[in-house]
Amino acid sequence: MIYPLLDHPRAATADISSLETLFYGASPMSPTRLKEGVEKWGQIFFQCFGQSEAPMALTHLKKADHDLSKPERFASCGRPSPWVHLALLGDDNQPVPEGEAGEICVRAPLVMEGYNGLPEQTEAAFAGGWLHTGDVGRYDDEGFLHIVDRKKDMIVTGGFNVFPREIEDVISAHPAVAQVAVVGVPDERWGEAVKAVVILRPGHEASEALAGELQVAVKEAKGSVQAPKSVDFVASIPLSALGKPDKKALRKQFWGDQARGVN
C-alpha cells in the first residue's frame, strides 16, 4: 500500500500533517523506498516484525530509529521487544557465531502452544525448545536485527546459497524500479538460476539496457553469484491473501510440473 502512495502524483505536495504514525510490516520493505517515505513525510514510520505463531511484535523499529543519517537501519526490523528472547540458530539448533546469519528463533510468553491437531508440525516448529520462525536474520553492531530472507525462499545455484532479499534491496535502489521479487528458476547447468521480476516506476520503459544495468548493479554490490541471470519486466507481481508478494505462485510460473517441490 505504501509504494502506490509514494508514487502518487500528489505524494510530495499533499497535506498529511494529521498523519502521526504509519505502521508497516507483514513483508520486507525496500530500504530505498522507506528512505524516500521518510524524506517526504518525516519520521512517522513504525515497523513491527512478528508472525501468527507469536502474535505480537517480536521486534520493533521505532519512529526515532528511522534516522536519515543512519541509512543502514532502513534495512532492519529493529530490536527485540520487551520479554522477547530471540536467538539466531543454525541447522544444528545451536547459536551461530556473532555476525553470521541464522534462523530467527523465539522464546516468549506470546508464543503459541502448538498447532491444533498437528503434533508433528508442532514438534518441528519447536525443535530444540525454540519456536522457529522460518526467517533468516543477523544482528548488526548496534543490536538491530536484519532479516536476510525467508529460509524457504533461499536459492541454491551452482552449490551456493543465495538470499533473494539481498538482491531485491540492490535492485530496488535503482531509480527506475518500483517493486522487485527475486526467485530461483530451473537451469540445466546451475540447478537454479537467479531471476529478477521487476515492476517499473511510471515514466520508465523496459529494455535490455536497463536489464543489464540491474544485473551489473547486483554484481558490483554482491558478486557474480548473486547477479540475476535474467530480468523480467512485468505489470504486476502475484500477491497472497495478506497482500505479500506470493513467491510460491511466482516460482510456479517458471517451474510448472517439474520435479522440484515449490515451497
Where do the PLM segments sit?
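AMP-binding/adenylate-forming catalytic core of the ANL superfamily
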Residues: 108, 113-114, 121-124, 136-226, ...
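Beta-strand->loop->alpha-helix junctions that form or flank phosphate-binding loops
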Residues: 46-55, 78-80, 183-186, 232
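Flexible lysine-rich "adenylation lid" loop at the C-terminal edge of ANL adenylation domains
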Residues: 93, 234-254
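Gly/Ser/Thr-rich phosphate-binding loop
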Residues: 6-72, 85, 92-95
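Active-site glycine-centered loops adjacent to acidic/histidine catalytic or metal-binding residues
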Residues: 26, 50, 78, 135, ...
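Glycine-centered tight turns that cap/initiate beta-strands
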Residues: 10, 18, 83, 176-179, ...
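Conserved ATP/PPi-binding loop(s) of AMP-dependent carboxylate-activating enzymes
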Residues: 79-83, 92-124, 162
